[in-house]
Amino acid sequence: MSDIKKAVLAYSGGLDTSVILKWLQDTYGCEIVTFTADFGQGEELEPARAKALQFGIKPENIFIDDLCEEFVRDFVFPMFRANTIYEGEYLLGTSIARPLIAKRQIEIARLTGADSVSHGATGKGNDQVRFELGYYALEPGIKVIVPWREWDLLSREKLMAYAEKHGIPVEMRHKQGGSPYSMDANLLHISYEGRHLENPNAEAEESMWRWTVSPEKAPDAPEIIEIEFKSGDPVAINGKAYKPHELLAELNRIGGMHGIGRLDLVENRFVGMKSRGCYETPGGTILLKAHRGIESITLDREVAHLKDDLMPRYASLIYNGLWWAPERLALQTLIDHTQQAVNGIVRLKLYKGSVSVISRDSANTLFDQNIATFDDDGGAYNQADAGGFIKLNALRMRIAETARRKRAKK
């Protein structure tokens, strides 16, 4: 790809992408456009601009974009309409951010006339797949530069040596009292990988967790909150309306105080290996419980069961980077259709790491107390009808057992 003219780099300003920026300049001699995304990760992003300028990047080629609203509204909330969990536990906080990064990189490439894009994901992880599937889905002819699959800087020590040689200003945060882990944060979650976590038999240190208090140290009194839903999406907490990204941030704050949303997981990566990561997803954990609570009274039984059947497939599509694939879009259409009547209010109890639904109410409820009651229902439900229903459902089993007995007599 020696004919590269201009590349859009997903740039954080950290060690890896700073080295990549310099390497791209030296290896390809191309013009670089940097893109830094604000996903509500809680970090100051302007230093990324200053670093890019130090590399000689033109001011008009430096993009620092606030994507918080779009991220939660168009990616997180649609995913939560499906009650999405990967391998029974993971709420896909990293996975769901990647398609938006890819989308914005392609938009910037079109805006600036760039012919290529680049990212800092390694050749061992899922993110390389997620980014590149997104690139090609949105811009089939785009060129993709992946330094980790080309260079020989395959260790942290080699990266640091390269940075020192080229005068790249990179802070080693763990030597300055920061975290020694590889972290990824956005409004949905924060993840931790690397160091002693690479041993699945080693317990995560309490000092690692940043968003949540230890459940043992959470308040001794439970907190009751209400979440209102409209068409499957949360719109208010305790009667106060929020924009999507503000609502998730508020749930993170509340959940973090009660030690909600910690996860220590060994997962199966798309590229074939198992990996261990720790995650904090306080707001998402609350939201998932609340959404299932409101669906329990507003969804038809077979529709709810169909959603549950499809959810693992939908989760795998997102985890594997197939957000833009036609099958994910088709599933989303079905999922969104099921949410039309998912309106109402759910009350939840938060206490020392746990979330419990304690009540749910909706104008669209399918729960009929007159039918469900243990008391006299006034003829709303004829219990005698159950006999025929049971016999018909038992018919195939009765036939099978009768046939078995005939065979046994021979």
Curated annotation (Swiss-Prot):
It comes from the Bacteria. It catalyses: L-citrulline + L-aspartate + ATP = 2-(N(omega)-L-arginino)succinate + AMP + diphosphate + H(+). Its EC number is 6.3.4.5. It is an enzyme of class 6 (ligase). ATP binds at A10, Y11, S12, G13, G14, L15, D16, T17, S18, A37, G120. InterPro entries: Arginosuc_syn_C, Arginosuc_syn_N, Arginosuc_synth, Arginosuc_synth_CS, Arginosuc_synth_type_1_subfam, AS_cat/multimer_dom_body, Rossmann-like_a/b/a_fold. L-aspartate binds at T122, N126, D127. It is found in: Cytoplasm. Gene3D superfamilies: Argininosuccinate synthetase, chain A, domain 2, HUPs, Single helix bin. The keyword Cytoplasm applies. One of its GO terms (cellular component) is cytoplasm. One of its GO terms (molecular function) is argininosuccinate synthase activity. L-citrulline binds at Y90, S95, N126, R130, S182, S191, E267, Y279. Transmembrane segments: none annotated. Keywords: Amino-acid biosynthesis, Arginine biosynthesis, ATP-binding, Cytoplasm, Ligase, Nucleotide-binding. Pathway: Amino-acid biosynthesis; L-arginine biosynthesis; L-arginine from L-ornithine and carbamoyl phosphate: step 2/3. GO terms for biological process: argininosuccinate metabolic process; L-arginine biosynthetic process; urea cycle. Homotetramer. NCBIfam families: argG, PRK00509.1. HAMAP family: Arg_succ_synth_type1. Belongs to the argininosuccinate synthase family. Type 1 subfamily. This is Argininosuccinate synthase. It comes from Polynucleobacter necessarius subsp. necessarius (strain STIR1). The gene is argG.
